[in-house]
Amino acid sequence: MNRLSPDQDRPCTASARIAFAALADYLDPILASIATHDMTVMPDGDAYRVTAAFGQATLRALPGELLIQVQTRDRQALNRMKHALAGPVGFIAARERLHIEWTGDTGGLAPLADLRVVRVAAVQALTPHLRRIVFQGDDLAHLDRADQLHCRLIFAPTGDAAPVWPMLDDAGRVVWPGGKMATRVYTPVSY
């Protein structure tokens, strides 16, 4: 692995060769899932080209394995691209218990690009089991879209004025350097 220093932002590359005997059963759903996460998936010869605002990748189905090659503009985008691809692969093919190991550039822990800190602005009881909760925060425009059905909220421990938020590691996995916090999935009604 090529460890990059924090001040060494340059184009980065990495790849993963995943043993995947049942790839043919999962490839189409994996590609469809990737395409629903703000990435474009296009056939490119014997492979698929994935393009996102933060990088690009090639996915190639080989006999018994999936080869993923990524290229990004900097080290933070590298972990984000790994997460954006390994996440759907691991989720869609969860029963296969795939081992995804990356080689190439690494950049250390990187912040979650979509993480926003919000505060409760108001709470209104609608029924005994349903509440309307209004949140306030900065830079929330990315949530205001028709295809954004759910969001995950992370609850910092009560009284913790400086929580350590989750990060992305060199494998593109979400890690909790300060310990895992409670999370819930919510369905917003309006923004």
Located regions from the model:
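Long, contiguous binding/interaction regions
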Residues: 1-12, 26, 46, 52-64, ...
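Short Lys/Arg-enriched alpha/beta "domain-start" segment
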Residues: 1-42
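Short amphipathic
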Residues: 12-19, 115-123, 132-136
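Short beta-strand-to-loop capping motifs
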Residues: 16-22, 69-74, 137
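A residue-level signal for conserved active-site and pocket-lining positions in enzyme catalytic cores
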Residues: 30, 68, 120, 148, ...
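C-terminal structural segments of small proteins and small subunits
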Residues: 79-94
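Short coil-to-beta-strand transition motifs
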Residues: 107-117, 176-185
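Ferredoxin-reductase
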Residues: 123-191
